[in-house]
Amino acid sequence: MLIFAAILAIFIYGMIAAMLGTILPDLSDRFHLSPSQNGTIAFAQALGLILASLAVGPLLDDEGKKVGLVLGLTFISIVLFALPRSSGFKSIVILLFLLGVGGGIVVTGANSLVSDVSENHRAMALNLVNLFFGLGAFATPFIAANLFGRNWVRLCYTIATLTVVTLAFHAATPMPGPTGSGRFVLTDVAPALGRPLLFMVGLFLFLYVGCEVGIWNWLVRHLIALGIPEKKALNILSVGFALGMLIGRAGILPILSHVPAITVTMTGSVAMAITTFLMLRTTRPAVALVLVFLAGISMAPVFPTTLAIVGDAFPRMTGTAIGFVITCGWTGLAVSSRIIGFIAGGDPRRLKKALMVIPGSAVLMFALDLAIRSALR
């Protein structure tokens, strides 16, 4: 039941992770938003993710995972019911900040729960559960394009309803309280977490999350700027990127029992750099679909496998350690959102240049992987 609870939470997080990129074109048209304002909205969501992930780690270690998951799902439900009633740019920024808070709590709580439940097969369990992130992320743009006719209001209410159902399930599911060895004690923070490895992994996720969520948030707008119809652009995001992540996380499961986790992240970094660079060079929808799909496969195992490395390296205060590196990831999203929005300015066609931040970050990730591998020896 605990793994199933984590799966439901990650599925909901997958749906909201793909949501901003899915509804951004319609929001931009309705409220006349520029790419620079889009960057501010993405920054607000990232700021919420940062603050939540930073604060929730000690809460999870001190009070248990259930408190965090219920709190995060409550935030998400409220925001999604309120978003269709937003009146303009400022209210959207506030609501996306709160959505980030809820998402940050949920993703940290769910991954920490799985890490504790499956200590002997942590990498496989985290990739299995995060497979459903890909399923949720696939569902959002696919439903918007093919079932709701790009009606973002219906999309918000549908995901909000699913979140309420998930919230009820978590509230009714018994979950273990904090363990004695992982319980947050302020005086233990420095010796438990003050290792260079944690900061190297944090910097790695700083780069990675900016890449992955950058595609979720900006790809559709970029494709539309190239002249690709919105429905086709949404399907490239869902059938291409989201489905690639879904298949990639399913395919990596048997490999993880034979290959070290650091080798998986190194391979993913190289593949990310190549596929995202080529993805941004093409203007043909069919080629873009294939390259976006391959980029999704490349990125699929990176995030959960990195969390597994943290879980193995920090058996004490695991929730706090995972919360820290995830916070670093959301910080990367905040920084990259500002950079991409600044480079693009008021012209969506400049996103082609701005999004080159993604393959550049992947190259730096590979260099960090080499340092992390040395630290693990």
What are these regions (language model features)?
Residues 95-131:
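Cytoplasmic helix-loop-helix junction between adjacent transmembrane helices
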Residues 27-28, 59-60, 143-150, 223-224, ...:
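Interfacial helix-cap and linker-helix signal at transmembrane-aqueous boundaries
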Residues 259-306:
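C-terminal transmembrane helical hairpin of 12-TM major facilitator-type secondary transporters
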Residues 51-90:
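Conserved MFS/SLC helix-loop-helix module at the cytosolic interface between two early adjacent transmembrane helices
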Residues 120, 127-174:
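Helix-loop-helix hairpin linking two adjacent transmembrane segments in secondary transporters
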Residues 20-21, 195-239, 243-246:
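Extracytoplasmic gate region of multi-pass secondary transporters
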Residues 32, 64, 85-90, 119, ...:
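Helix-breaking motifs and short loop linkers at transmembrane-helix boundaries and internal kinks
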Residues 52-64, 248-260, 344:
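Helix-to-loop junctions at the C-terminal end of transmembrane segments
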